[in-house]
Amino acid sequence: VTHADWLLVSGERGNPSTRLDGRRPDGEAWSRGNDARPLVHGAVYFAELLAGISAMRAGDLLLFTDWRGDPDERLGGPGTEIGAVLGRAAERGVVVKGLLWRSHLDSIHFSQEENRHLGEEIAEAGGECLLDMRVRPGGSHHQKMVVLRHRGRPERDVAYVGGIDLCRNRNDDATHRGDRQSLPLASAYGPHPPWHDVQLALRGPAVGDVEAVFRERWQDPSPLSRSPLTRLRSLVHRDDTDADTLPPQTADPEPCGTHTVQVLRTYPNRLLRGYPFAPDGERSIARGYHKALRRARSLVYLEDQYLWSPRVVDCFAEALRRHPRLRLIAVIPAIPEQAGWLTLPMNLIGRIKALEELRRAGGDRVATYGLENHAGTPVYVHAKVCVIDDVWASVGSDNINIRSWTHDSELGCVVYDESPDPRRPQDPGGLGDGARVFARDLRLELMREHLDAGGGPGEPAPDGLCDPAAAFEAFAQAAAALDAWHGGGRPGPRPPGRLRRYVAPDLPTLQQVLAAPLSHILVDPDGRPMGMRRRNTF
């Protein structure tokens, strides 16, 4: 078994214009010797990020991209608002550079004004934050990364990649009582929506790869927007629309761990003129999934915000059809974030069809769950995690839908651990790959939380959760017990666990007819060239 069995070699990325795969003398499209740590929950990530930024000195470099940034979101207690933390860093002489998505109108629940205010706060302190609308019509920059580089102290360098924005709702912890600084979701989530999310902390040479992703976007000479109205508004507001020159990229940090990391992305086939670093777009996230799923034999464990679109899940369905031992667990939001008469079916119709496709392929080997906290409030699942056969693990900004795989900018990292896991079963896939410590520990940490099974990273796991078949059954039993307790009027103590069996609601025919075309156009659009769409290739 080699890395090339699981990871994309440079020619398989499908984008010869990027600098990513040519950064190393050996020509490998991944970096070895990293230390990758999953930071489960926004509170864990924010606490570490606050400590890291606070320790930065003059001459250090802080780079970030975000979908939404709220300047008043606290990383910790009072005085730790993200705008203030970044501003103080810039005032100390840290070089602070950011790219925020310049959104569509706030009236349709996007984030233009908050992004503008965060950018202004950083600029006033001496940093630079650009509002970047270089996307397809209706698209967004969805990448979420922070890179901290330290002049003369490369052992402190770290990059964060995953699903957590620097904004409201994200600062939740394992109790899932929600962020006190909240934005409204569907009413079922209450005034402080519980929020489940994951970010990856990377140390080692992969930090240089993540920085290179930022630099490609920052150095794009294209205007930040093609819209004459947007450019006029920027002129009126005196927005910074010209990226200053970045200091030269320093050498990658030295190897410090056992994790091989591959950086994968989505960029759309941008109309008229593409990105200089991806003229025809890049769909390496989709390609990475397709390659890894060809080796799936035992268990695919997913946590995802959406899980939409038969055009995306067909590669999962094909794996289920080919291999009768393969099981799939998906943890998703029980209720979409918007619950209007038309927005609800627009968000549901793609998921309903995707789950139908998966169940046709895998039958009762496919199980889908929502989460609730101990008060019975649904937990909004915003994590984007996939673990295959305890070997291949992915954490990123990308969801399982056609938008994330083709239309918006996305950033994810695949981790392949060089350390085999000694716990049984040692080779759940049966192909000689052997379970890997990182992938298995990530799956177990997430499953333990959802089962209220205790334990933590690095602690001995219950044997039943290491075994994919037993873990599949443990989820089913926990959800059945909690469903029965709710269905019976909640008699006696609440059963352990947070899992509820997901059952897709029935949509009236009229809603389906109206929602289907709007879903394809507005909610889950396709950013591929027409030939790829017809062949459903990536």
Predicted feature residues:
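Charged, low-complexity intrinsically disordered terminal segments
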Residues: 2-538
